Amino acid sequence: MHCSSPKMVCETKIVADEHDAIHGTKKESILWSSPPSSAPLNPAEAKDVRKDVVFIREFERGDQEEVRRIFYEGIMERIPNTAFRGLWQQPKTQFLYALLTIMCFYMTKSVMLTCCAPLILMGARYYYSRKVIQNYLDCALHTDMADIDAYYMKPTGSCFWVAVLDGRVVGIVAAQGHEDENTVELRRMSVDSRYRGKGIAKALGRRVLEYAMRNNYAGVVLGTTAVKLAAHKLYESLGFRRTGQSEDYRLPGMSRSPLERLFFQIRHTRYRLQLREE
């Protein structure tokens, strides 16, 4: 089941089409091919590859810096999304903030201060979203993302892939096996913001599904705190079904102080794709 065996190597080819995004369409941009060996493309072969073709291959040590950059930038994007857009997913918090604003008026009798109250609340949400997400990012960068080779490439049942376009790493995804549940967990999926909308994320997701099927796992699971609807549509287009949801999820690195609980809330959604009956 080790991911470095020839049977588990993926030289997935993606014809990058700007119009083929994550939506399920009849036009399929992903061409699957099984290479005769696990050797990476040599420079001569790489020159023959069109610039709009992406190859998905296993992680190599030289990818570490770019992989961490893509992961870092992808997580940092969640700060404003969680602080502002995420508020629409928290009706109880909206009610509480409205109540605080009304209380401000009754206590101060100042229209100006009352008008400033929502801005202060939003500023506090941004501050605590940044604080919590940076703490989470620090935890990740000092655990599995600190040594991808040791954490994902060496253990049985785990693997890490990168999507490469014109010699540049543009996307990442990991698979972590859970033998006790006979499932693979899809983790760390992210695509460079400059290359989104080309079907790369969908191809990375399919690579994890292919890995799970080849190794006879019963299902693939994932958990996401993504606020954007596009991320959830991506998982659903791959065949995942929602199995649960937590409205007040605790991220690693959270202190759960009263102020943090007041100004930071995040929804965690769990998905599962059943590959076969056990």
Model-assigned labels for residue ranges:
Residues 9-10, 41, 128, 138-144, ...:
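Conserved catalytic-core motifs of GNAT/GCN5-like acyltransferases
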Residues 68-71, 75:
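Hydrophobic alpha-helical core bundles mediating ligand binding, dimerization, or RNAP-core interactions
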Residues 12, 75-80, 85-98, 102-187, ...:
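Acetyl-CoA-dependent GNAT
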Residues 59, 189-191, 224:
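Hydrophobic adenine-recognition pocket in adenosine-nucleotide-binding enzymes
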Residues 188-193, 197-214, 233-237:
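Conserved acetyl-CoA-binding loop-helix of GNAT-fold acetyltransferases
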Residues 1-53:
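Cytosolic, low-complexity regulatory segments enriched in Ser/Pro/Gly with interspersed Lys/Arg
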